Amino acid sequence: MVLNMLKHRKWDRHKKGGLNFTELGFGSAPLGNLYKSIFDEEANDTLNRAWDLGVRYYDTAPLYGLGLSETRLNRFLRSKNKNDYILSSKVGRIMKPCKAEDQTGIGKWFDVPFRKELYDYSYDGVMRSFEFSLERLGVSKIDILYVHDLCIFTHGSKTASDERISEFFDKKGYEAMLSLRDQNVISAIGGGINEWEVCQYLAER
C-alpha cells in the first residue's frame, strides 16, 4: 500500500495517548483560492488524491480563503473516520462579514466570501475564532490548534509583532488555548509562524 511508504510520527509530550500523523501533511491554503480560483470539484479531487497517497494530516486556517479552505475540508472529511486523520487549524484572526471593497486579501484570495480579518489574540478572540472554525469544519474538536502569524512578516515590524505577542499573553489568549486543551476539544497547541525567533521565544516562555 502507498500508505506504508509515508513515514509516521508519534507525538505524546503529555503522555495522554498523543497524536500519530504522517510526516507529509496537506497544507490547504490553495483550497482557499490562493492566487487563483479553483472549482470545488478540483479541490475535492486534490484532497482525494492526497488521501489515496496516504496523507493523513490536514492543516488549515480561517485566513485561507477567508474561511473557504475550512469549508472545503468539511465537505471532504465528513465522509472519513475521525480516527483516521489529524486536523489542525489556527487562531489569531476573526473573519468579519464586510462589503466587497473592504475584503481582506484582494488580489490574493479569489472568489471567496466577503470577509475582512480582525486580529484578536485575546482570550475571547481565541475562543470565538475556534468556535467559528468548528462550525466551518463541521467537527466537534480539532487535533492541533496553532496561534497564527505572531511575526514581523505579518505585522510589519518587530514593535508591532511584539505588541501582538504581548496581547496573546497579557489578554490571556494563551490561557484560552490551554483551557481548550484541558477540555479535550484540542489535543495539542503550537505556533503557525514565519520566523524561528518567535517560535523559540514562545517555546521558552
Regions found by a protein language model. Give the residues of each.
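Short, flexible, mixed-charge acidic loops at enzyme active sites
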Residues: 98-108
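Short, surface-exposed linear patches
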Residues: 46-49, 79-80, 108-111, 167-169
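Glycine/proline-rich, positively charged
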Residues: 109-205
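Flexible domain-boundary/linker segments
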Residues: 67, 75, 90, 104, ...
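Glycine-rich, phosphate-binding/catalytic loops in enzymes
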Residues: 42-44, 73-76, 104-105, 161-165, ...
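N-terminal binding-site loop/beta-alpha segment at the start of enzyme catalytic domains
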Residues: 1-100
